[in-house]
From Swiss-Prot:
Record-level GO cellular component terms: cytoplasm
Active site: C117 (proton donor)
Compartments reported by the entry: Cytoplasm
Keyword set includes Cell wall biogenesis/degradation: yes
Name this polypeptide is given: UDP-N-acetylglucosamine 1-carboxyvinyltransferase
Gene: murA
Family: Belongs to the EPSP synthase family. MurA subfamily.
Amino acid sequence: MERLLIRGGRRLEGEIRISGAKNAALPIMAATLLADGPMTVGNIPHLHDITTTMELLGRMGVGLTVDERMRVEADPRSLHSCHAPYELVKTMRASILVLGPLLARYGEAQVSLPGGCAIGSRPVNLHVEGLRAMGAELTVEEGYIKARCDRLRGARIVLELVTVTGTENLMMAAALAEGTTVIENAAREPEVVDLADCLNAMGAKIQGAGTDTLTIEGVERLNGIHYDVLPDRIESGTYLIAAAITGGRIKLKDTAPKLLDAVLVKLEEAGARIETGPDWISLEMEGRPRSVSVRTAPYPGFPTDMQAQFCALDCIAEGTGTITETVFENRFMHCLEMQRMGADIRIEGNTAILRGVPALKGAPVMATDLRASASLVLAGLVARGETRVDRIYHIDRGYECIEEKLAQLGADIRRVPA
């Protein structure tokens, strides 16, 4: 076990490179199961969830090699098992993404019900119902989804709720199905579009990515290719807030400004000066931020994965802001920890009301999920004295070398044994 120690009060300044998006890399790594030969995936972030996915693929028999630039070559021709065991799946919800590819390519799958962050029910029933509509036989027994099929058949699937992983799983399954599949109320997130772009480059026939209706014409085979995943928009937003909250000035390289419109608008509302180019964003903040109010929504709305970070900003901003969470349940656990640091926060249903205070005070705090842990680090950067963030294994699931990147910008932060 490790923790982060942060001494706040330093203005962040400098340049950093943004990593590839974990939420794009994970489904694309699962999509390698669909290929009929070796496939190389580049711009992969070095994260615990990526390592877990590689271990899962390797356990199934996929041949894996990784070079010094974190390019992963996966060769599914040596696959000998369609079993995703509990000891791997329990730590990461995205492991459910192997279900669709295994069924479509090999006709069977046995996948443990997934784990991951404890931020609401996040049911997998939409995956199961969609695959049943395509002709698969699925049962849930002893904590496992057990599935079989001949060749999947195209179907019209109307998702009851917008689900990113559900859309991705069904899209991958439909790519090799017989006939045409239409997915309505599909997720529109950039990571879904990136997966569709990857599948199309492999030979799939997918139309409508980025809209709420996907049309997938099944093909007989998909080729192994090289594909680079898109930059991480959530990591980008987190470091922009780190600069804004400390009155700093930074430039992000290898990022994608067009994916961050909802976040950049709110940062400008808070008083930041922002400039963008094709693959870079610069931000400068002078003085205390102004409070902002946000309401989370599926893309292209304000991302739920950024609300905890804006909570940290509102804690020390001038004025009162509100954060309304409409996507997941139980996603304000970080607020209790911020109150230990002197934050003035009141929770009413699915809304947090934050009245900015002149300063936070360093304190021992505990991370409860991935984005909550990032928000506590942000609060520590601006707090007086030392903040100790425990249970940082959460943050290692989604941020590559966070203490190194922040130290590169001038933060006083270090990782120590707990």
